[in-house]
Amino acid sequence: MGEINNNKEINEKDDEINNKRLKYEGFIKKEKKKKQKIDHSIPLKEKPTQEDIDSHSECLFWIVNKKKHRAEFCKYKRAKDSILCNHHKPIDQISSEPQPQLTDYNGDDVTENNNNSTTTTTATTQDDNSKPKERKRIHCPLNPTHIIYECKLQKHLKACPNAKVGQKNAHIELSKKEPYYKENINDLNENVKLTLEPIILSQVSTENLINISIKLDQFFEKFFKNEIQSLNQTHKSFDKIFNSDQQLKHIQQESSIINLLENSNLYNSDNVYLEFGAGSGKLSNHIFMSHEKKSGHILIDRMKFRSLKKVDRLIKNEKGCHHFSRLLIDIRHLNLSNLSILEEKPFVITSKHLCGCATDFTLDSIFNLLNNSNEKVNNNFKGIGIATCCHHICNFNTYSNQSYLKDQLNITPLEFQLICSISSWATIDENKCNNDDDDNEVEEDDELIKKDKKEKKEFENQLKIEFNKQDVFSIKRKEELGYKAKRLIDYGRYLFIKEKLNLPNTKFWIYTNQSKENLFLVSNK
């Protein structure tokens, strides 16, 4: 027994020593990675000395980088019969050179034999005399400092940093050529259009704020006599699919949405799920996984996400996926009638946190689809499940139910704009009203998306912070009014779904307690 205890003590000491060593090594690595301070007082070498030239065996092109305060030789290998690499050789000297030929270890051409064909994988095209063709090198048309093979021009242009600015919006232009594109088809064209600016709450008088707060209380009591039902339960597939704490909050919200879809008979592996405002498509992936990878999906978003390839591949490359497509298009211009798959498969409209007027465009797109399609499409349409958010960026011109504002609320367009602004108060936090709200999180993997989110957040914070300077309401009262404003905006959408889309079985649900953006509109036929 004594020997066993001694061995345990030795092992524990060894583990402790190893842990300390690993921590120390990690610390050293971090210290090495830290940027060294640049001493700009030391003059840069404009030209190399003969000693520098003699000691350098690679390309002898001298690079002076004033930004990094560094001067050094290029580190690429020299080209054949030259003191420079192919990148730095004059273009007239490298305009043509033989294309390399791939060989195996026996010196033979590398080929792949398939059942139906033989494909040569050599990097050269040979003529009758078995002489490799020459590849021409040219300047990049976007940046003359880039020298590339002419045969690889198109590939280079896709990755060229100078092309990225134009590429950010290229998909928007390309979408105009698609059969499902129709200019402003979902722009609620029957609406009254007025010239209205967003209302800044700091510019609203105390009297107007008090008057609109009284109306909000009255309307909320009228339309929401009973509390909105809450179903904050994860789906049965949750524990089987996810076993980590990474982004647990969002995963739980998605699981709760799936649970509500199932309870509303909108959950079936035969369905094609159209996710509006899909972002990187995590809700669709969660639905797909919960169906044991046996469902169809159409992801719709006007943004182009770098990370979309990750989630998209998780769905479309599976054998059980009976349909997949991603539509890079603004919902305002999406003509669902030209999606042929909707005639072939039952489909459900879904979304998690569909921002502002995008919800209204989505409802209008469904209205246009059901009124302009054949009986097959109408029969295949099973229902809607939409989680709304960002009511503060809604506006009168694009609101889906203007008749509700006029006939039931009896408010003016300006009063509606004020209600939209007040809805931003729902997400005020007493301790950190300036901090970003993770509940409306989108994948920030593209500069365009970062800019779009930043502008939206600046506008939201302006509405939150720049309230009337007399501080008419307490923080708690503001949150209450903001919540009521959101629900009244959603109530008009609820009536639109029931009356215009002819879906009387429409319900409100509170689907999460982890976010103040927590309302889910669900309806089935």
UniProtKB/Swiss-Prot annotation:
GO terms for biological process: tRNA methylation. The keyword Zinc-finger applies. One of its GO terms (molecular function) is tRNA 2'-O-methyltransferase activity. It catalyses: cytidine(4) in tRNA(Pro) + S-adenosyl-L-methionine = 2'-O-methylcytidine(4) in tRNA(Pro) + S-adenosyl-L-homocysteine + H(+); cytidine(4) in tRNA(Gly)(GCC) + S-adenosyl-L-methionine = 2'-O-methylcytidine(4) in tRNA(Gly)(GCC) + S-adenosyl-L-homocysteine + H(+); adenosine(4) in tRNA(His) + S-adenosyl-L-methionine = 2'-O-methyladenosine(4) in tRNA(His) + S-adenosyl-L-homocysteine + H(+). Residues 38-50 have a biased composition (Basic and acidic residues). tRNA methylase which 2'-O-methylates cytidine(4) in tRNA(Pro) and tRNA(Gly)(GCC), and adenosine(4) in tRNA(His). This is tRNA:m(4)X modification enzyme TRM13 homolog. It comes from Dictyostelium discoideum (Social amoeba). The lineage of its organism: Eukaryota, Amoebozoa, Evosea, Eumycetozoa, Dictyostelia.
